[in-house]
Amino acid sequence: MKLAVFSAKSYDKHYFDATLRKHHPALCEITYHSFALSSETVSLAQDSDAVCVFVNDQLDAPVLETLYANGVRAILLRCAGFNNINLQVAEDLGFFVANVPSYSPEAVAEFAVALIQTLNRKTHRAFNRVREGNFNLEGFLGRTLYGKTVGVVGVGRIGLAFAKILHGFGCKLVAYDPFGGEEFKKYGEFVELGDLLAQSDVVSLHCPLTEGTRHVINDENLGRMKKGALLVNTSRGGLVNTKAVINALKSGQLGGVALDVYEEEGALFYNDHSGEIIHDDVLMRLMTFPNVLVCGHQAFFTEEALSEIAGVTLGNLEDFVLKRTCKNSLVREGHLVVPTDKEPVRL
């Protein structure tokens, strides 16, 4: 069994190799590619039986058809999201497709809270200021989180972990999720999205990207938000209309924005562009605001999460090889496992 891993970094290789040696020594031979899977690079998977991809790899119909023609039969997503793959085409072609639905919800939840506190208390700016010998506090005034209302959009594993942390801060929690969730009711109440936006001092997104959730944060919904509220997104960049956010920042409707994801991140994130001219004018404009914090999709990036990703991904591959039922399969017995009766808004 030959496995081609795309968008591979040094840490991917470290954890996959370690997991392979310890738990699956005879499972497969791995080839690592540092570049993303796309129509330009798909030919390099022609000698592989399976491919392993990440959030910014491209698996549209032409890529899937080429993979199949070249003998690939299994697609392993080492992430929870699957918006970058055409699952209907994958089903039609007969691919085995599996993801890692939960590799460290606490890691992402903790990072979301860190973004809120960094943005709210301006610790990133304070760090730079004191290094220059300036201990002035002007411009650093924040707000106490205790007693504030925090809106959680999507209370799956990550959203629930986030809610538990903010409950410990003494925040009032409201959530929107058409799936509901009994456990969340221990910490807060469910409301409609419009009510959540109007009530919340902080809005945190914890939902996958679907056609129904794309640009859920747009001009209309930003206008419904409480004036001066903070917006945090650690889920998928396409949930947020960046141009609309810029307008809301300029008008003062938004009090601040913290993004670990960006709708056009595919051409930028996970690579070093410090010696280049970045031509994304929208992102560059966004980062000129003093009340904006942008990170490079690192919320998941902990030792525990990387170990779990490698373990579950290789376990999924073993299920495929041994023809076992895979609990993480997105295409099972010729049918999509993704809900179709209502748009999923949880991770």
Curated annotation (Swiss-Prot):
CDD domains: LDH_like_2. Its EC number is 1.1.1.272. SUPFAM superfamilies: Formate/glycerate dehydrogenase catalytic domain-like (SSF52283), NAD(P)-binding Rossmann-fold domains (SSF51735). Gene3D superfamilies: NAD(P)-binding Rossmann-like Domain (3.40.50.720). NAD(+) binds at residues 157-158, 177, 234-236, 260. Transmembrane segments: none annotated. The keyword DNA-binding does not apply. It holds the Pfam family 2-Hacid_dh. InterPro entries: D-isomer_2_OHA_DH_cat_dom, D-isomer_DH_CS, D-isomer_DH_CS1, D-isomer_DH_NAD-bd, NAD(P)-bd_dom_sf. It is an enzyme of class 1 (oxidoreductase). The keyword rRNA processing does not apply. The active site is at residues 236, 265. Keywords: NAD, Oxidoreductase. It catalyses: a (2R)-2-hydroxycarboxylate + NADP(+) = a 2-oxocarboxylate + NADPH + H(+). It comes from the Eukaryota. GO terms for molecular function: D-lactate dehydrogenase activity; NAD binding. Belongs to the D-isomer specific 2-hydroxyacid dehydrogenase family. PANTHER family: 2-HYDROXYACID DEHYDROGENASE HOMOLOG 1-RELATED. 2-hydroxyacid dehydrogenase that is capable to reduce pyruvate, hydroxypyruvate and glyoxylate in a NADPH- or NADH-dependent manner. In contrast to 2-HadhD/morA, does not recognize 4-methyl-2-oxopentanoate (MOA) as a substrate. This is 2-hydroxyacid dehydrogenase A. It comes from Aspergillus oryzae (strain ATCC 42149 / RIB 40) (Yellow koji mold).
